[in-house]
Amino acid sequence: ILYYPILVVVLTAAGLYFTCRTGLVQFRMFWESIRLVMEKPQNEGAVSPFHALMVSTASRVGTGNILGVSTAICLGGPGSVFWMWVIAVIGGASAFIESTLAQVYKRRDSKGDSYGGPAYYIESAMHNRTLGVLFAFFLIITYAGGFNMLASYNLQSTFAAYSWYDPAVTPWIIGAILGALVGYCIMGGGRRILRVTGVLVPIMGLIYVAAAVIVVVMHINLIPQVFGMIFADAFDFRSILGGVSGSCLMFGVKRGLFSNEAGVGSAPNAAASADVSHPVKQGLVQMLSVFIDTLLICTATAMMCLASGTPITKEIAGAGYVQNAVTVAFGSFGPILITVCMVLFAFSTLIGNFFYVDNCLIFIHKKEPGKSFMTGFRILASLVIFVGAGMSMAAAWDIADILMAFMCLINIPACLVLGGTAVKVMKDYERQKREGRDPVFHAADVGLDLDEVEYWK
């Protein structure tokens, strides 16, 4: 019930509403979003649009892009891929709205850096700290708990293809190593997270997409058949309506939402950290992250798996299906390639998630928590990663899905209430562009209460 009909209806309706309200912003301003990615920050040493994008992409582009897609195909059918595309396309507008709002209502810390997110715009614009704290709480347990346990499980599951894998021992060894490595990175705080993700994300994306392209080129004659499978299964309404919970629609929505996180309220925490002259700039950049995630990385996985001709069965859902697919093209090197990609994807996801968690801990405490508290929390979070490696696939996915749904059901209504502000800010940006200027934001120009927009006073 939580996912269907509630979340499916909320996500789809909100995405379509924002798409119409912004005048198809994800299509009209797509090239503008690409141009803005490499824009330099306003102040030297501040967080650039690119680095903020890499943090959100590090979290978005994770194990779900490989194993989430393969699981959706094996359990929901090839049509799941189409519904992932739909969620991404309409979700681009939702991502733009939430990230623009995060920029508008962001705050400034003692070092001059900016921070913010849904919890902050809920408190500042809706004057509801209780709801903001509730959102922050769900984000913390979702990202430090559910998502990190899932990433840890997904990573260790790729090692099951090797003869030395012992299901009673190996998951715990991998979990311990992963927890220790992530613990080291996150002990350095936000700046270290930004540096690590800025290096890892482009590398892992290029390696994985290159491998997928090779597989697709080797089976280029099957691509028309692959698209035929996707569309035929996507519109098999008798199958969908006959068993919604296990249909391609349901798995497409679940894995699409998990993969691109549009509307969930996570990426705005990274968006708020970017030092830009106008909130819309980062809103557009974060919108691009949704397309990188689903329309590029997830599609690469789907094409690679379906074009390989590997039989689709429920028994190989997850790592097995992807590894079998790449083995067709790369032989015994295939599983090794997927393992390397999974290590990079899982690691970047884990450390990117902690950027969001830190932001919400600051919100709940009303200031940056003490060093001893943060050290203790990060040690506990590293232990959660260790525990996640030993979980079952069903438990890992179910926990992540349920927690993410609660975040979405708080953030989307907040965006609907505040969406008019984001649209006003967008029109201000477009007006300045038409005048031939590099847009600079002044809160008073769009009629905002200056007491609510601390950073832009």
Protein language model annotation of sequence segments:
Residues 90-98, 176-190, 201-221, 254-257, ...:
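Selective recognition of specific alpha-helical transmembrane segments in multi-pass small-molecule
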Residues 19, 97-106, 211-229, 237, ...:
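Extracellular/periplasmic helix-exit of transmembrane alpha-helices
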Residues 1-63, 73-80, 91, 416-457:
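N-terminal alpha-helical transmembrane segments of multi-pass membrane transport
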Residues 14-19, 87-112, 118-153, 157-185, ...:
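Helix-loop-helix module between adjacent transmembrane segments
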Residues 43-75, 101-119, 123-125, 140, ...:
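Alpha-helical membrane segments and immediately flanking helix-loop junctions
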Residues 21-26, 65-69, 78, 145-156, ...:
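Transmembrane helix-loop junctions in multi-pass membrane proteins
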